[in-house]
Each structure stands twice: as structure tokens, then as C-alpha cells.
Design a protein with these regions (language model features):
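C-terminal motif of bacterial Sec signal peptides marking the signal peptidase cleavage site
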Residues: 18-22
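Mature, Sec-exported extracytoplasmic domains of Gram-positive
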Residues: 29-421
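Bacterial N-terminal signal peptides that target proteins for export
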Residues: 1-10
């Protein structure tokens, strides 16, 4: 009986032990299952989060991931083309400054090397034309018809580096893979920058300007406005248009004086800003920047009037009447542009470009000029105006009048005189 009782107790203990083992094993399986489920959920959430971030970035349109093949192609092409003008870069006068700035002639020589290899190539030299532009022109015209495709534009920078822009159109959106090639201290080409960005909007004008706005960070992501506007001249200007632009309007521009952004003629010259225009005419005549430190007490009467009369059909008496003149010291006042006398405008940064030249029966020449603005408004003709000039046999010329067409003066900021009576 005692033995039976012991047997029963042993059996009961065994069963209880088995039950406890089974429970422990079941708890272990459940625990492992919960861990696996949690890891799967976490992994799914991370994947979902990464996908959402990628989708969000694509929606923003900037800092897009660059395909490895595109990256390799861009880097290889940049370095290969820079090697074409290595000999020019090595012997070029780079000055002593840490930031290399090459002269225009050297940059144009580099452009010719790339041109001869058959690539579309532009420069940052003002009024220079893109060489081998035809393929880009065709690409943009096809894009306007909704046809997908791609085109690459190269640009020689003023430091001798090379920009590469591959524009890709998928039938709906335009993208650009931008790459910048630079020279290192050993004159070896390298890559400093590469990006992939969507164009927010774009247009190709009849005049041949490719105007576009890149997607960029916007408030509240950034505290300041980032300007993504760009303009690239595709179709070339004629040689005469380039020459007249350089000779007659580049030195003036649209800020600091109002020769090109007001209506006037030989019968109505009282509204011109003579005190403002002096420094620009000085730069045109002498080929160097006006140094105000040489004139601490104002500009001497004879020097001021002589320069103005060289470029305008006006008398010394009229200048003294229209300009701000110091009778006591016999000098004309001058003030540097600053926050107290000038509010910067996008229009003021525009580049004047001669688009047509007409010889008149009276021997004068009428230049049709358009203001090209590459900032924010991104417009290849903010205003169109006709500038009348008379050329002398010795190569000198005088401005005779300016007329802004199509009520364009209503669409630009009022002019600010830097010095007021």
C-alpha cells in the first residue's frame, strides 16, 4: 500500500512536471513569436517610412538620388572634356588670388577646343554664343511637342572648370543632372558637385533663350528665398548684335542711371540722372572702374561736363541746370549706390541685349534692345526699347534718345535718383 502510494505520488509528480514543461515551452514559443512579429512590424514601418521620405523628396523635386550610371557618365564626360584644354589651362595666367579667374580670351580658347570635338558648349563670357547648339535647339523644340528625350550642355567656367547639364524630358516633366568639374592643385580634373533636380517650369523662347526654374527649398524649410531661376542662350546672336551690345549698352545696364530705362530724346533730357551716369560713362571711356576716392570733394566741373558732352548732345549750361551742382566748390556731387539711395530690384540686374539694328536715313542708327533678367522673373525681354545713336568716323558715338515700347515702363520699378536737390 505504501509502495502504491509512492507510485501514485511519483506518477502525479511526473505529470505535473510534464505539464509545467509544456506550459514553459508554450510560453517560450509565444514569446519568440511576439518578438518576430514586433521585428516584422518595425521593419515594415521603417520601409514604409523610407518610402514615404523618398516619395516626399521626389515631390519636392530637389536633392533627388543620382543613378549610379548617370553619375559615372557625368564624371567621365566632364574629366574627358577638361583634358581637351588642359594645355591651355596649364599655361594660362591664373593670377595670385586663391580663386582663379581667367580672362575672357582664355575661356573662349577653351571653348573652341570643346567645340572642335563636336559638343554643345557655352561660356560665362557676356554675349558669347553657344557653339554646336543645333542638337539642343532640336531637343527643346521636340520637348515643346511632348516628345521625350535628353540633351547635354557644357559650359566653360571663368575659373577654367567645366559645367555639365544633362536635361532629361520624360514627356511630362523636365529634369537636369548638373555636374561641376574643377582643377586641383596638380592641374588634374576632379568633380566637386553633382545633383539631380526637377524643373518647376520652363520655356524656350522664339529668341532662343531656354528659361527655367529649378525646384528649390522653400519656406518654412528655409528662412530665406532661394532663387532657382536660370536662363541659357541657345540660338546665337549675330556678330553685329554682339558687337553693338558690348559697345553701346553693356557698360550702362539698368541700375544706377536711367539712360536705358526712361523715355527721353534730344528735346527732353532734363529727367536723366547725370550724377548717376558719370561713373558708367567713365568706365566705358577709360576701361576701368571709377574710383570715388580720387574725388573726395566731388567731380570737377570741367571733367564732369566734358565726359557727359562726349556721349550726349548737351551743353555745359544744360548739365549744370539738370544735374546736382555745387556752385561754391564748382563740383558735381557723386554718391555710391547704397541702402539709403537705392532699393535693389530684379529688373536692375538685367542684361541689355541688342536684338535688331536699323540704319536711318539721317545717318543715325536705332538699336532695338531687350532686358534679359535671369533672377526670379526669368524673362528674356522684361522691356523692349529703341536706343538711337550716332556714330562718328573716328569710332566714337553719342546717345540721342531712348523709347520704351509697349508701355513697358509701366511694368518696371520707378527710377530712384541717387542724389536729390
Amino acid at each position: 500500500m505504501e509502495l502504491k502510494r509512492k507510485s501514485i505520488l511519483l506518477i502525479m509528480a511526473f505529470l505535473i512536471g510534464c505539464d509545467l514543461c509544456a506550459c514553459g515551452k508554450e510560453d517560450s514559443v509565444v514569446g519568440e513569436s511576439l518578438v518576430e512579429d514586433t521585428e516584422e512590424v518595425s521593419s515594415t514601418e521603417e520601409t514604409k517610412s523610407a518610402e514615404e521620405e523618398a516619395a516626399e523628396q521626389w515631390e519636392k523635386g530637389y536633392d533627388l538620388p543620382v543613378d549610379e550610371q548617370e553619375r559615372e557618365e557625368a564624371e567621365t564626360d566632364c574629366k574627358k572634356l577638361m583634358e581637351l584644354y588642359l594645355d591651355i589651362y596649364e599655361t594660362a595666367d591664373k593670377g595670385i588670388a586663391s580663386n582663379v579667374v581667367l580672362d575672357d580670351q582664355t575661356v573662349l580658347e577653351m571653348q573652341k577646343k570643346v567645340k572642335d570635338a563636336g559638343y554643345p558648349i557655352a561660356t560665362m563670357v557676356t554675349y558669347s554664343n553657344m557653339e554646336n547648339y543645333e542638337s539642343v535647339d532640336s531637343f527643346l523644340k521636340e520637348c515643346m511637342e511632348g516628345k521625350s528625350g535628353s540633351a547635354v550642355i557644357y559650359e566653360v567656367h571663368n575659373d577654367g572648370g567645366l559645367g555639365r547639364m544633362k536635361f532629361i524630358f520624360d514627356g511630362t516633366d523636365m529634369y537636369v543632372v548638373s555636374t561641376i568639374g574643377i582643377w586641383n592643385a596638380d592641374n588634374n580634373p576632379g568633380i566637386s558637385y553633382i545633383s539631380y533636380t526637377r524643373l518647376k517650369e520652363w520655356k524656350y523662347t522664339d529668341k532662343g533663350w531656354f528659361c527655367y526654374e529649378l525646384c528649390v527649398p522653400e519656406p518654412p524649410e528655409v528662412s530665406e528665398i532661394v532663387d532657382g531661376s536660370c536662363v541659357i542662350r541657345i540660338k546665337p546672336m549675330t556678330e553685329e548684335q554682339c558687337e553693338m551690345s558690348e559697345r553701346c549698352v553693356r557698360g550702362l545696364g539698368y541700375q544706377g542711371q536711367n539712360l536705358l530705362c526712361s523715355n527721353w530724346n534730344v528735346e527732353n533730357m532734363s529727367e536723366l540722372d547725370y550724377n548717376g551716369m558719370f561713373e558708367y560713362l567713365y568706365g566705358m571711356k577709360y576701361g576701368e572702374k571709377f574710383n570715388s576716392e580720387d574725388y573726395p570733394n566731388g567731380i570737377p566741373k570741367e571733367e564732369f561736363e566734358s565726359l557727359i558732352m562726349e556721349y550726349l548732345p548737351i551743353t555745359a549750361e544744360q548739365i549744370r541746370e539738370y544735374a546736382v551742382f555745387d556752385e561754391e566748390n564748382q563740383t558735381y556731387l557723386w554718391a555710391r549706390l547704397g541702402c539709403f539711395n537705392y532699393a535693389p530690384t530684379f529688373f536692375g540686374t538685367s542684361l541689355p541685349e541688342v536684338v535688331d539694328i536699323k540704319e536711318n536715313q539721317d545717318g543715325t542708327v536705332t538699336l532695338t534692345v531687350e532686358a534679359v533678367c535671369d533672377m526670379v522673373i526669368c524673362d528674356d525681354a522684361v522691356i523692349t526699347h529703341e536706343l538711337t545713336v550716332r556714330f562718328a568716323e573716328d569710332g566714337s558715338f553719342q546717345y540721342l534718345g531712348n523709347e520704351i515700347l509697349n508701355d513697358g515702363i509701366m511694368h518696371i520699378p520707378d527710377y530712384q535718383y541717387r542724389i536729390k536737390d
